From Swiss-Prot:
Its EC number is 6.4.1.1. This is Pyruvate carboxylase 1. Substrate binds at residues 565-569, 638, 898. Residues 140-337 form the ATP-grasp domain. It comes from the Eukaryota. The lineage of its organism: Eukaryota, Fungi, Dikarya, Ascomycota, Saccharomycotina. It comes from Saccharomyces cerevisiae (strain ATCC 204508 / S288c) (Baker's yeast). The keyword Transferase does not apply. Its main location: cytoplasm.
Length: 1178
């Protein structure tokens, strides 16, 4: 049985006879559009393509395809302007028709003439008609003959700047310099009063010459806020002309249409009729043939002015087809073949419109960066569809590489329906349905535009986009799935990059959430039933003062659980993620409903969340708060430091605390690392202003009972007295190193209870020495109202004492209000969690009684051990602990808690790594380069230590390099300009809130890095922890809930071989049943590649390429003195030119590019030196 080709089926409906081979002299979506109609007409189709377009879709849609010239013979654009080469291809392959599409040679009369002379049928108006209307100046003369109104302009083309200036002098500003040939917004420049006419003229002519091969321009009066209305025309070879009604093309940017509507929604009937009549009149006057478009402007008084006739098919012809049902391309081809309009059934009185249609051009442009065209590889492409949705696309599919050589349009989306509003909503739906990943698109902008009240009313004008900055307040596509895949792919290739991780988690599955049981043994449904009321309800109903009073009146000792903060800080390097806290949160809300509080925020957890876990600490707080509404949340606040490591302006602390209170923190444990009361008061006052519970805290240090100790009972009672005078709700005692022995606990708490019988006392310790259970038992028996504990599996060593051990110690003496069975059920979860985070465990085997000598805080002990191992000092751990003790005394025997503990630790490691004794340090102090933290301490930036700074050691260390502060550091700091910070963050990172401002104030660089990480990988907190910390195994499937009701099913399919040229591997995933491919650089491989330096777009001395393209002209050289706004280079990209200007005054230090060089987006072009240019005389 013989095999028939699909193409042979066309012979059954051949309409054009033997002449049926058509070549489209164009690229992208328009050849595809034409090929489809040609195939319907049983024609054979031929595509042409440049070397750069050899993978383009239009080449594949044709029956035959031929490259234009040899490799390197033409530029990417120049290939499609090579008239003789294109005609030669047509002749060689027996082409009968040539369709020019739009752009390129579509309005070139020379091309039309040569096509006809070559014996090929030209689909379009003849050359003489193109000359009479395609040239905008000739078209004005035509309008005068037809008595159709036009906008005042030069009578003919101009060749010099002086002619442009003469027109400006006669008619005034504003004017527009326009290319006499072509369209699409290229070769156009609006010049307003004060603008540089000469520069605009030069750019317009240069751009026109590049785009259309002809730089001729003319000047005309520029109308403010007009509508742009165009009429679709069809004319045959027998003098018949019809119009297919109008399109409203007023929504434009850079004179290039963005959204088109047919018919015009708000055009009065009499104006529409006059425009349609004039359009037909113009076509008949010039003897027009084939398809064309008459374009008009309509001013605010509904006066219309003829602009030009475009002698070609338009990009937006699709929406006219949708409302009339007429295939314009089919009409073009058949008219060129000799058919008359009547033969095609096209009578004016029979042509009607039905409903409305809207077209949106989806481009790879970034609206947030002034519509900068984006380049790169499309990773994901999923298009819209359904009733009333038409797509006309070109190179739009997964894997497409978007180059800088051609127009940035991916696809035209046209929607049609019975009313304007129905179509608008349909278009919104269609745009939302698109999924395009890997390159930026203008879809977020289009959605904002379609929902703007002006667009809804249909009253837009040609500069509507430029005049409406609200359009740029866009809701961006989140691209969550693709970003997560990039992270998982990176981990699959390179492993985890989380600092501090050693090896992989020991737990190979997700921890199981335990079931709680009520008194009757029934399982409690913690997700459906509200948790029991707790102490937070008392706080919310009665306020901080009454809350504190009721805590004091409680008949027993309350417990605060530190598992969510200090416990994992002390044992697991603060690495426990929001995902795992949120998983157990509903269960915790039921199990620990009677708990005084959960310590869950602040301190090191704040910056570690951003710095290492790539999470937003505010999102963690809000999420946990929503899941645990009944138990108070407590945070750690470092007085005048907030959660930073040094003092900040007072207004930054006030601002931060307010955000913390508003987002869920109830109790603020406020401390100062030196017990500096002036520093402490800043935090206390901030909490009072915010309406939180103040737990002003005394930091405990050393062995209080040892004779001669600096920090004795009298010292603590004196500090406590001053804290009480500040008006604290609760008095906190913070034993950071766990050096409070049971006897000291009994004495101190007993003394405080006797002195302050009505004040709640809250004690915190660490179990580093193994005595914490005994110490906290002593505190409780001595009258402490609250003591800190941790879940059993997260207790002991450098963490807090075990809750069950403490309950056993207090049993029969003091009530805690805790359900022991519920605690055991919770503990099962945390036992598994400990295994999940085993890769962050410190190598501590048991208690360290030496803590009474070195006094290293519990949270720091594990971190210091890790740092020592990272610095190669792990084998010298005993020496490090000894050095820590010596460093403490060098600094004056200070209270050690973040950030002062870091100062001691840095100095200790400095001593060990440089093999220095304390005597060496004292002797060489005036010549050693100490760590910055030590310098900050001695300058006084952390505060004033009890007993003062040690002299002359302080002076030797500072060596007049730094001042000696004697007052509170915050008094020396200027208040932050919060409004300016907010505005700067908004400009850099988009949608920000007050919490972002607070994060930036605390940790500017960390916040910036976090935002960059989130932009790259999205919200990583949704990933299961095993997948976050370790590579997926092949065929392993995980579920990722990105929001309620949206779950991603991700399976790793394979990791590809190394591409030795690029150093990349391809990682294949199955995402919700759809294959995704991610390219990842293998960082274990060294690949020699030539890369250009990238500009820091926030550095005014860096001038970078705003988009990928070709440098047309470099206007400066090394040593040039330039001013802000002065052009430094001209870039050609996406068939348009733009001037790159200097963002600041300066002198050119280096130029990194030359004329004709290709550049990528953000490539560093020019580097400036910070020097004000010298004024020169003319």
């Amino acid at each position: 049985m013989s095999q028939r080709k699909f193409a042979g089926l066309r012979d059954n409906f051949n309409l054009l006879g033997e002449k049926n081979k058509i070549l489209v002299a164009n690229r992208g979506e328009i050849p595809i559009r034409i090929f489809r109609t040609a195939h319907e007409l049983s024609m054979q189709t031929v595509a042409i393509y440049s070397h750069e377009d050899r993978l383009s879709t239009h080449k594949q849609k044709a029956d035959e395809a031929y490259v234009i010239g040899e490799v390197g013979q033409y530029t990417p654009v120049g290939a499609y302007l090579a008239i003789d080469e294109i005609i030669s291809i047509a002749q060689k392959h027996q082409v009968d028709f040539i369709h020019p599409g739009y752009g390129f040679l579509s309005e070139n009369s020379e091309f039309a003439d040569k096509v006809v002379k070559a014996g090929i049928t030209w689909i379009g108006p003849p050359a003489e008609v193109i000359d009479s209307v395609g040239d905008k100046v000739s078209a004005r003369n035509l309008a005068a003959k037809a008595n159709v109104p036009t906008v005042p302009g030069t009578p003919g083309p101009i060749e010099t700047v002086e002619e442009a200036l003469d027109f400006v002098n006669e008619y005034g500003y504003p004017v527009i310099i326009k290319a006499a040939f072509g369209g699409g917004g290229r070769g156009m420049r609006v010049v307003r009063e004060g603008d540089d006419v000469a520069d605009a003229f030069q750019r317009a002519t240069s751009e026109a010459r590049t785009a259309f091969g002809n730089g001729t321009c003319f000047v005309e009066r520029f109308l403010d806020k007009p509508k742009h209305i165009e009429v679709q025309l069809l004319a045959d070879n027998h003098g018949n002309v019809v119009h297919l009604f109008e399109r409203d093309c007023s929504v434009q940017r850079r004179h290039q249409k963005v959204v088109e509507v047919a018919p015009a929604k708000t055009l009065p009937r009499e104006v529409r009729d006059a425009i349609l009549t004039d359009a037909v009149k113009l076509a008949k006057e010039c003897g027009y043939r084939n398809a064309g478009t008459a374009e008009f402007l309509v001013d605010n008084q509904n006066r219309h002015y003829f602009i030009e006739i475009n002698p070609r098919i338009q990009v937006e012809h699709t929406i006219t087809e949708e409302i009339t049902g007429i295939d314009i391309v089919a009409a073009q081809i058949q008219i060129a073949a000799g058919a008359s309009l009547p033969q095609l059934g096209l009578f004016q009185d029979k042509i009607t419109t039905r409903g409305f249609a809207i077209q949106c051009r989806i481009t790879t442009e970034d609206p947030a960066k002034n519509f900068q065209p984006d380049t790169g590889r499309i990773e994901v492409y999923r298009s819209a569809g359904g009733n009333g949705v038409r797509l006309d696309g070109g190179n739009a599919y997964a894997g497409t590489i978007i180059s800088p050589h051609y127009d940035s349009m991916l696809v035209k989306c046209s929607c049609s329906g019975s009313t304007y509003e129905i179509v608008r909503r349909k278009m919104i739906r269609a745009l939302i349905e698109f999924r395009i990943r890997g390159v930026k698109t203008n879809i977020p902008f289009l959605l904002t535009l379609l929902t703007n009240p002006v667009f809804i009313e249909g009253t837009y004008w040609t500069t509507f986009i430029d005049d409406t900055p609200q359009l740029f307040q866009m809701v961006s596509s989140q691209n969550r799935a693709q970003k997560l895949l990039h992270y998982l792919a990176d981990v699959a290739v390179n492993g985890s990059s989380i600092k501090g991780q050693i090896g992989l988690p020991k737990l190979k599955s997700n921890p199981s959430v335990p079931h709680l049981h009520d008194a009757q043994g029934n399982v409690i449904n913690v997700t459906k039933s509200a948790p029991p009321s707790g102490w937070r309800q008392v706080l919310l109903e009665k306020g901080p003062a009454e809350f504190a009073r009721q805590v004091r009146q409680f008949n027993g000792t309350l417990l605060m659980d530190t598992t969510w903060r200090d416990a994992h800080q002390s044992l697991l390097a603060t690495r426990v993620r929001t995902h795992d806290l949120a998983t157990i949160a509903p269960t915790t809300a039921h199990a620990l409903a009677g708990r005084f509080a959960l310590e869950c925020w602040g301190g090191a957890t704040f910056d570690v969340a951003m710095r290492f876990l790539h999470e937003d600490p505010w999102e963690r707080l809000r999420k946990l708060r929503s899941l645990v509404p009944n138990i108070p949340f407590q945070m750690l606040l470092r007085g005048a430091n907030g959660v930073a490591y040094s003092s900040l302006p007072d207004n930054a602390i006030d601002h931060f605390v307010k955000q913390a209170k508003d987002n869920g923190v109830d109790i603020f444990r406020v401390f100062d690392a030196l017990n500096d009361l002036e520093q402490l008061k800043v935090g206390v006052d901030a909490v009072k202003k915010a309406g939180g519970v103040v737990e002003a805290t005394v930091c405990f240090s050393g062995d209080m009972l040892q004779p001669g100790k600096k920090y004795n009972l009298d010292y603590y009672l004196e500090i406590a007295e001053k804290i009480v005078q500040m008006g604290t709700h609760i008095l906190g005692i913070k034993d950071m190193a766990g050096t409070m022995k049971p006897a000291a606990a009994k004495l101190l708490i007993g003394s405080l209870r006797a002195k302050y019988p009505d004040l709640p006392i809250h004690v915190h310790t660490h179990d580093s020495a193994g005595t914490a259970v005994a110490s906290m038992t002593a505190c409780a028996l001595a009258g402490a109202d609250v003591v800190d504990v941790a879940i059993n599996s997260m207790s002991g060593l450098t963490s807090q004492p075990s809750i069950n051990a403490l309950l056993a110690s207090l049993e029969g003496n003091i009530d805690t209000g805790i359900n022991v069975e519920h605690v055991r059920e919770l503990d099962a979860y945390w036992a598994e969690m400990r295994l999940l985070y085993s890769c962050f465990e410190a190598d501590l085997k048991g208690p360290d009684p030496e803590v009474y000598q070195h006094e290293i805080p519990g949270g720091q002990l594990t971190n210091l051990l890790f740092q020592a191992q990272q610095l190669g000092l792990g084998e010298q751990w005993a020496e490090t602990k000894r050095a820590y003790r010596e460093a403490n005394y060098l600094l004056g025997d200070i209270v050690k808690v973040t950030p002062t503990s870091k100062v001691v630790g840095d100095l200790a490691q400095f001593m060990v790594s440089n093999k220095l004794t304390s005597d060496d340090v004292r002797r060489l102090a005036n010549s050693l380069d100490f760590p910055d933290s030590v310098m900050d301490f001695f300058e006084g930036l952390i505060g004033q230590p009890y007993g003062g700074f040690p002299e002359p050691f302080r002076s030797d260390v500072l060596r007049n390099k730094r001042r000696k502060l004697t007052c509170r550091p915050g008094l020396e700091l200027e208040p932050f300009d919060l409004e300016k910070i907010r505005e700067d963050l908004q400009n850099r990172f988009g949608d920000v809130d007050e919490c972002d401002v607070a994060s930036y104030n605390m940790y500017p660089r960390v916040y910036e890095d976090f935002q960059k990480m989130r932009e790259t990988y999205g919200d990583l907190s949704v990933l299961p922890t095993r997948s976050f910390l370790s590579p997926l195994e092949t065929d392993e499937e995980i579920e990722v809930v990105i929001e309620q009701g949206k779950t991603l099913i991700i399976k790793l399919q394979a990791v590809g071989d190394l591409n030795k040229k690029t150093g990349e591997r391809e990682v294949y995933f199955d995402l919700n049943g759809e294959m995704r491919k991610i390219r990842v650089a293998d960082r274990s491989q060294k690949v020699e590649t030539v890369t250009k330096s990238k500009a820091d777009m926030h550095d005014p001395l860096h001038i970078g390429a705003p988009m990928a393209g070709v440098i047309v002209e470099v206007k400066v050289h090394k040593g040039s003195l330039i001013k802000k706004g002065q052009p430094v280079a001209v870039l050609s990209a996406m068939k348009m030119e733009m001037i790159i200007s200097s963002p600041s005054d300066g002198q050119v230090k280096e130029v990194f590019v030359s004329d004709g060089e290709n550049v990528d987006s953000s490539d560093l072009l020019v580097l400036l030196e910070d020097q004000v240019p010298v004024e020169t005389k003319a």
